[in-house]
Amino acid sequence: EISTFIDSDIKIFFLKGKAGTGKTTLIKEIINQFATEFDKIELMASTGRASKILRNKIQYGVNTIHKSIFKESKISIQNTGVFQSQFRLENIKENESILYIIDESSLIGNTAPSKDELAERHLKFSDEKLLKNFLSFACSDENKIIFVGDPCQLSAINEKNELTPALSKEYFASKFNLESNEFTL
């Protein structure tokens, strides 16, 4: 399934499975098998804890999505005296073919927090729709993206539907008009 996806024009693949089904082992195999097919393979996770666990298991560099796609653009002091950092989307890496593998994708949302929630934050990221921001950053003609996760896990904070956006073929088709493939272990 993965080989067929890599050789196709489709840009998005969902690798789904419950805990203990071999997703992490498969990530390591994907990296080994397709390292020469791309200029670079970037491995990301939705949280710092998830990236640390994955890094330790497969001995490969892993960053959070936020660290990989955002750059600090402004630091300000609010009326309350609280510092606030604002981040903008990094520039798209052109002329490079990159395979992005994102672990713990069930935690990636696409719903922005309310104005009240944003006012309380010390960090602000672009328009706060992480999935949309990631796709804006990573989708190009040369790149491929594999979202890995457990569809039975809780979905991201602020997601009001039962659907986990970053693991849903239907969501990508309806919201982003992107065709995708999927496989469940």
Give, region by region, the residue ranges found by the protein language model.
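Conserved ATP-binding/catalytic motifs of P-loop helicase motor domains
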Residues: E1-L185
